[in-house]
């Protein structure tokens, strides 16, 4: 009998500590009120039961001020049924707003990995050209072109593979690849210096514009961690039609210049005509970005 009274005396504080928000203790509804609610993670379970440090000296993983589960769309916890007033509502400061959670995206998509592969192949191609190993360079360049075709095809046909990071990473990979190729081919006397200077100048200005757009579209406070976080999407870039044509013409010139020493047509008039076409599309592409300006940038809402 003494042990039973001690057990009943210890159960009282535990019932208060484990009481869900808004539940009333009584003979009829005490057992139903103490049934644990359906929780999707330990963080949600700790939040709903309101475990008090005075009763339990423990901290469940995920019970901190982070998002529970995915965190998307949970601006405030739902009050328990039967409760009223401010006592039945949990503080909303522990939840991440839906607008902030929706700005995060998965950067590890297949198109993004293909774009990073293309960036990694660029110095390999430059080394092969400097060593005048044009046969192997043609094969590596074909592989880089295949990654360019695949990442665009996958991003267009699978919605979960499209990302704001990819809209900037794909043209950045093209510019890194083209810049290294043109510098290497100019060193090998296969492309004239003025054409390479025009292409590099345009790409440097576009890359600087991308960094500026990234800075302007970040919500305050702007931090370096947020600026260089690839998961935090703020804007999508939309290339112009003439820019796509220009990229294709530049890559055609690279392929023709790589094949020129192999098939002995380095002094062909057709190659020189291709130089002029590339210069024209490069200048037209630079003007299109200057003319359309903000139309090429789509700011993601909710920032």
Swiss-Prot record:
Belongs to the CDP-alcohol phosphatidyltransferase class-I family. Its main location: mitochondrion. The chain crosses the membrane at residues 110-130, 134-154, 191-213, 251-271, 272-290. It is found in: Mitochondrion inner membrane. One of its GO terms (biological process) is cardiolipin biosynthetic process. GO terms for molecular function: cardiolipin synthase (CMP-forming). Its EC number is 2.7.8.41. Disulfide bonds: none annotated. Residues 71-80 have a biased composition (Low complexity). Residues 69-88 are annotated as: Disordered. It comes from Mus musculus. It comes from the Eukaryota. This is Cardiolipin synthase (CMP-forming). Catalyzes the synthesis of cardiolipin (CL) (diphosphatidylglycerol) by specifically transferring a phosphatidyl group from CDP-diacylglycerol to phosphatidylglycerol (PG). CL is a key phospholipid in mitochondrial membranes and plays important roles in maintaining the functional integrity and dynamics of mitochondria under both optimal and stress conditions. Keywords: Lipid biosynthesis, Lipid metabolism, Membrane, Mitochondrion, Mitochondrion inner membrane, Phospholipid biosynthesis, Phospholipid metabolism, Transferase, Transmembrane, Transmembrane helix. Disruption phenotype: Knockout mice have severely reduced cardiolipin (CL) (diphosphatidylglycerol) in mitochondrial membranes. It catalyses: a CDP-1,2-diacyl-sn-glycerol + a 1,2-diacyl-sn-glycero-3-phospho-(1'-sn-glycerol) = a cardiolipin + CMP + H(+). One of its GO terms (cellular component) is mitochondrion. It is a multi-pass membrane protein.
């Amino acid at each position: 009998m003494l042990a039973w009274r001690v057990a009943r005396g210890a159960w009282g504080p535990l019932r208060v500590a484990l009481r869900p928000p808004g539940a009333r203790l009584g003979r009829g509804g005490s057992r139903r009120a103490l049934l644990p609610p359906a929780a999707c993670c330990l963080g949600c379970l700790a939040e709903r039961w309101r475990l008090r440090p005075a009763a339990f000296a423990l901290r469940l993983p995920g019970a901190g001020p982070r998002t529970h589960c995915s965190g998307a769309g949970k601006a405030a916890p739902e009050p328990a049924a039967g409760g009223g007033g401010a006592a039945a509502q949990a503080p909303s400061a522990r939840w991440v707003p839906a607008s902030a959670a929706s700005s995060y995206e998965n950067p590890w998509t297949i198109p993004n990995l293909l774009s990073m592969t293309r960036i990694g192949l660029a110095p390999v191609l430059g080394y092969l050209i400097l060593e005048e190993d044009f046969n192997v360079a043609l094969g590596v360049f074909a592989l880089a072109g295949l990654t360019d075709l695949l990442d665009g095809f996958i991003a267009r046909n699978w919605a979960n593979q499209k990302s704001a990071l990819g809209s900037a990473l794909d043209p950045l990979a093209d510019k890194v690849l083209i810049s290294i190729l043109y510098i290497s081919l100019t060193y090998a006397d296969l492309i004239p210096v003025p054409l390479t200077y025009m292409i590099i100048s345009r790409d440097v200005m576009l890359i600087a514009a991308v960094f500026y757009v990234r800075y302007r579209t970040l919500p305050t406070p702007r931090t370096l961690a947020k600026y260089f976080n690839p998961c935090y999407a703020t804007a999508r870039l939309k290339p112009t039609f003439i820019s796509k044509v220009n990229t294709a013409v530049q890559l055609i010139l690279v392929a023709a210049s790589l094949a020129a020493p192999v098939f002995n047509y380095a002094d062909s008039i057709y190659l020189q005509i291709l130089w002029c076409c590339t210069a024209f599309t490069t200048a037209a592409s630079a003007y299109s970005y200057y003319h359309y300006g903000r139309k090429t940038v789509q700011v993601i809402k909710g920032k």
